[in-house]
């Protein structure tokens, strides 16, 4: 409907959340030229770069991220107000709401699949918790997608294979004769690199128990940046779990690391009760399930 939301704001928010001109054109139902013109105009007005164009993707600048954080709550409020006071006789568009920590690559994959299928949706991103999910699914025409597991009476979990699995980095001083000293590992905190927190822990628990003989690993889910995590690893203060693809991208040596295979990223889909469920929901959920199952992270 967009009678309250400024066109420039909607384009900016959409580009921030899709990271792609091609996906944004499908979401907004306009061609690429007007999108480029709006962003170029904004950059001239603000005298600051908003995006760096690289290999077909848009990388937000720090300036753009600052603006996004400040205006997103305003955008969400206006959008909700439009939905509330809009014409009651018109079927509301299905909303797909992504948890703000959901991996960008899978987010773009889902958006692209929904767009190609012709499913009319409104894409949003926001921080969620169990209470927010409950409220959204009681009052909105939406599906909430998160890599975090919250209690909700209507939900399902999809698993996406993690390409190459993950590497468990162990402090060098814990190795004896080329093998990790199990006795020294017990009780050592296990840190998660960003993104690894959302993996299915059953597989990782099983690896610790079967391979290392550790039945109760000291997992730490604190938000620690990669530099600090690597420093603690080097000092022998912690172990570290990092996806294989990240190890390759960073060029990390895996001489003192163990490979954990068969790891999957868990995606939880939250949606309204069956009384409020519509064919649009079933179609979208089935499509998302298929896409996540066939893909790798």
Swiss-Prot record:
Stretches assigned to coiled coil? none
One GO MF annotation is: DNA binding
SUPFAM superfamilies reported for this sequence: Winged helix' DNA-binding domain
Give me the positions annotated for DNA binding: 21-40
Phenotype on disruption:
A disruption of this gene is no longer virulent in mouse infection. 20-fold reduction in cytopathic effects in human monocyte-derived macrophages, loss of actin depolymerization in macrophages.
Q: Which Pfam families match?
A: HTH_1
Q: Which PANTHER family match?
A: HTH-TYPE TRANSCRIPTIONAL REGULATOR LRHA-RELATED, TRANSCRIPTIONAL REGULATOR
Family under the similarity heading: Belongs to the LysR transcriptional regulatory family.
Query: Cross-referenced NCBIfam families, in alphabetical order?
Result: PRK15243.1
Per the entry, what this protein does is: Positive regulator for the plasmid-encoded virulence factors SpvA, SpvB, and SpvC.
Q: What is this protein called?
A: Virulence genes transcriptional activator SpvR
Q: Which species does this protein come from?
A: Salmonella dublin
Q: Which gene encodes it?
A: spvR
């Amino acid at each position: 409907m967009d009678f309250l939301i400024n066109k420039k704001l909607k384009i900016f928010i959409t580009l921030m959340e899709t990271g792609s001109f091609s996906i944004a054109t499908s979401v907004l139902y306009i061609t690429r030229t007007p999108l480029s013109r709006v962003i170029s105009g904004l950059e001239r007005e603000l005298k600051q770069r908003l995006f760096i164009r690289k290999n077909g993707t848009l990388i937000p600048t720090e300036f753009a991220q600052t603006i996004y954080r400040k205006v997103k709550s305003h955008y969400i409020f206006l959008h909700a107000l439009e939905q509330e006071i809009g014409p009651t006789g018109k079927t509301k568009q299905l909303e797909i709401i992504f948890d703000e920590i959901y991996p960008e690559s899978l987010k773009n994959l889902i958006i692209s699949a929904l767009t190609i299928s012709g499913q009319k949706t409104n894409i949003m991103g926001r921080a969620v918790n169990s209470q927010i999910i409950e409220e959204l699914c009681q009052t909105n025409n939406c599906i909430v997608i998160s890599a975090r597991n919250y209690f909700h009476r209507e939900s399902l979990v999809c698993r996406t294979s993690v390409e190459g699995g993950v590497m468990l980095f162990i402090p060098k001083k814990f190795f004896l004769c080329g093998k990790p000293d199990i006795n020294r590992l017990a009780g050592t905190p296990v840190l998660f690199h960003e993104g690894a927190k959302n993996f299915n822990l059953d597989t990782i628990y099983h690896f610790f128990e079967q391979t290392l003989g550790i039945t109760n690993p000291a997992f730490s889910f604190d938000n620690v940046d990669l530099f600090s995590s690597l420093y603690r690893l080097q000092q022998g203060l912690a172990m570290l779990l990092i996806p294989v693809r990240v190890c390759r991208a960073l060029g990390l040596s895996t001489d003192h690391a163990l490979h954990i295979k068969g790891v999957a990223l868990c995606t939880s889909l939250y949606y309204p009760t069956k009384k409020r469920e519509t064919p649009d929901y079933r179609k979208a959920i089935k499509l998302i399930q298929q896409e996540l199952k066939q893909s790798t992270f």
